Amino acid sequence: MKKLPIIAFGALIIGFLALCIYSYNQNQQYDQWIASLARSKYIEKDERNGNLGDNYEGSKDAKALIVEYADYQCPGCATTFPYLSEIVEEYKGKVGLIFRSFILSYHKNGTAAAHAANAAALQGYWQAYATILFKNQSEWEDLEAGKRDVKFKSYFEEASKNQGNADQFLSDMNSEAVKKKVKSDMAVAKLVNITETPTIIINGEKLPTISVNESTFKKTVHEMIDAALKKAESGSSNNTK
C-alpha cells in the first residue's frame, strides 16, 4: 500500500519533466521561426503570429519598405505616423510602410491599444483604426480598462464607418490570435535590438535619431527612400534581414 503514493509521486515527476521538455522544445521552435524571418520585409501570416501578417500601408512588395516599430501610446509615434502615411501616398506604389508594435512597459494602455489595432486588422480596418488611435491618443492613454474599451469600441465604429462587427472586435481584442500577433511583433523587435519608439528602418537602414519636426523628419526620410529606390533600381537592393 505504501508503494502507491511513491508510484503516484514518480508519475507526477515524470509528467512534470515531460511538460518542461515539451515547453522548451516549443520555445526553441518559436525562436528559430522568429530568427528565420526576413525582418526588413513583409512578414506573412502564420499560425505563430495568429494568422495576422504585418500591418501595412501602400505596397507590401514595394522597392522601398519602411518598417516602423512603434507604440500606440508613444507621443513621438503619434507625431510621425501621419508623416509616414503622407510619404507612402506621395510615392504611389514605390514605397510601403510596415508597422510592428514595440510596447514600452511604462505605457499604461500601450498593450491594450496594440490589441485593439490588431482586432481591427482582423476585419480589414487597421490603417483607419491606427490613424484614429494616434490622433486621439490623449483621450485614452490614462483611462481605466472599462472606459478605455468603450472608447476603443467607438473608434472601431468610426474606422469601419459602422460597417464592422463591434461585438466581434471586442471579443478579438482578447483573442489568442491577437495575443500571438503582438507577441511576434515584440519578438522581432527584440531580435533587431529595438530599444525606443519610433524606430524606423528603410530597406534595412536605420533612420538616425532626429527631431520629429515635420520638415526635418520628412527631408531625412525622403533622402533615405530616394537612396533606397536608386539602389533597388540599379539592381543592388538590400537583401539584409
Summary of predicted features, one role per range:
Residues 26-42:
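Ser/Thr/Pro/Gly-rich low-complexity linker/stalk segments immediately outside membranes or between
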Residues 67-72, 78-160, 190-192, 220-223, ...:
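Structural alpha/beta surface segment adjacent to cysteine/selenocysteine redox centers
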Residues 47-64, 89:
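A short beta-strand-turn-helix
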Residues 56-57, 140, 173, 207:
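Short clusters of hydrophobic/aromatic residues that line enzyme substrate/ligand-binding pockets
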Residues 64-65, 197:
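Short loop/turn microsegments at loop-to-beta-strand junctions
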